[in-house]
A protein has these predicted regions:
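Activation targets extended, charge/polar-rich intrinsically disordered C-terminal tails
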Residues: 95-152
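A structural motif
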Residues: 71-92
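Glycine-rich catalytic cores of cysteine/serine-nucleophile enzymes that process amide/ester linkages
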Residues: 6-67, 93-104
């Protein structure tokens, strides 16, 4: 099916983007899953919720992490199940700003969608920054060469 990427937005963006970066103490304010066919999947406040679109990649504004272990069928299944659902403002504030686990099954926010699509439990607990860290670590582990067992 081709390689899937986690795209992390680091551009200046809107006031909302800047507030997310400030609160999470991160350079990232948004994330998307980029499929091999060029579609970008996420939940976007600007687009009103869960959607697919094509975005012209500008590496000044986006960092990409390959996700070779991602299951495209699982991602598409979750997308089809949630496509058109609204943006989860309450869940975003409740799980990212307060120590609450709010899970609205009718709405999602960006990192919640991406984490759920990648199969992570408690997807609403992930910020774009935390999801990027976890995916980067999984990528490093899954692409590491075989260890020399004599040194184990």
């Amino acid at each position: 099916m081709g390689l899937i990427y986690l795209a992390l937005y680091k551009g200046r963006g809107t006031l909302f983007n800047r507030l997310i970066r400030l609160w999470t103490r991160s350079k990232y304010s948004h994330c998307e899953l980029v499929l091999a066919d060029g579609r970008w999947l996420s939940a976007s406040a600007m687009d009103g919720g869960v959607r697919a679109k094509r975005i012209v990649l500008d590496l000044e504004h986006w960092d990409l992490i390959p996700v070779p272990w991602a299951d495209a069928r699982q991602i598409l299944h979750l997308f089809e199940k949630h496509q058109g659902k609204g943006y989860d403002w309450l869940g975003l504030f409740g799980s990212q700003l307060l120590p609450l686990t709010i899970d609205n099954r009718r709405r999602m926010f960006c990192s919640e969608f991406c984490a759920a699509a990648l199969g992570f439990p408690l997807a609403q607990r992930y910020s774009p920054a935390l999801l990027g860290e976890v995916v980067q670590r999984v990528h490093a582990i899954t692409t590491a060469g075989p260890q020399d067992e004599a040194h184990a």
